[in-house]
């Protein structure tokens, strides 16, 4: 199956993370940042076409620094449990689209919602927020897959800090290779 066929077909399936892929997904897909100031400098330097943040802490940190991502994906959780009330309060200001995505999976609903949100931020210039019931960690993969080139995808990495992925053809191909290893 070619990459374009895969991209089209994957949005109609629930993808299940195989155990043997977990270790590979711990590796960052982009540049690692330890401080929000460095993320902001990177944004100002690269001037990405769109900014998409996946994760409560990075999304809230951007908002507090007056940067509202074009798409914000959050679940009110961190690796240590629920986020604190300050983060919840900041993220609750939005009226998010609510979806279900169980841990270790990328739901069909999540795939379709992410694809639709990317289309909307490109055509209608609207900002979108997605509240995930379950877990949002793996959603960084379809976000990269569906994002336009030169977009910046930011996500929290529980051991390293924030990972910034400047979307190009190479990273899209890497994501497709990873997604092809998922079970249906």
PLM regions and their residue ranges:
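N-terminal, charge-rich interaction modules
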Residues: 1-102
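Gly/Ser/Thr-rich loops at beta-strand to alpha-helix junctions
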Residues: 52-60, 133-140, 160-161
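Short, solvent-exposed amphipathic alpha-helical segments in soluble enzyme
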Residues: 63-71, 87-90, 144-149, 169-172, ...
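Short hydrophobic/aromatic-enriched beta-strand-loop microsegments
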Residues: 69-76, 149-157
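A polyampholytic, Gly/Pro-enriched intrinsically disordered region
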Residues: 92-101, 173-184
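Internal catalytic-core helix/loop-beta-alpha segment
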Residues: 94-132, 138
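Hydrophobic/aromatic-rich, well-ordered segments within soluble, folded domains that form packed cores
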Residues: 128-154
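Short, flexible loop segments at boundaries between secondary-structure elements
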Residues: 156-170, 183
């Amino acid at each position: 199956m070619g990459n374009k066929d895969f991209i089209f077909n994957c949005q109609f399936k629930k993808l299940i993370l195989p155990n043997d892929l977990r270790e590979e997904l711990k590796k960052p897909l982009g540049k690692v940042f330890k401080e929000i100031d460095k993320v902001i400098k990177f944004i100002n330097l690269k001037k990405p076409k769109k900014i998409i943040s996946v994760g409560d802490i990075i999304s809230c940190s951007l908002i507090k620094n007056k940067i509202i991502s074009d798409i914000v994906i959050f679940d009110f959780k961190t690796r240590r449990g629920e986020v604190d009330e300050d983060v919840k309060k900041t993220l609750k200001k939005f009226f998010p689209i609510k979806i279900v995505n169980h841990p270790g999976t990328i739901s069909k609903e999540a795939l379709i919602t992410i694809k639709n949100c990317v289309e909307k931020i490109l055509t209608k210039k609207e900002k979108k927020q997605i509240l995930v019931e379950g877990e949002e960690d793996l959603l960084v993969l379809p976000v990269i897959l569906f994002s336009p080139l030169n977009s910046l995808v930011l996500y929290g990495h529980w051991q390293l800090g924030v990972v910034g992925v400047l979307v190009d053809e190479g990273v899209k191909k890497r994501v497709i290779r990873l997604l092809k290893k998922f079970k249906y």
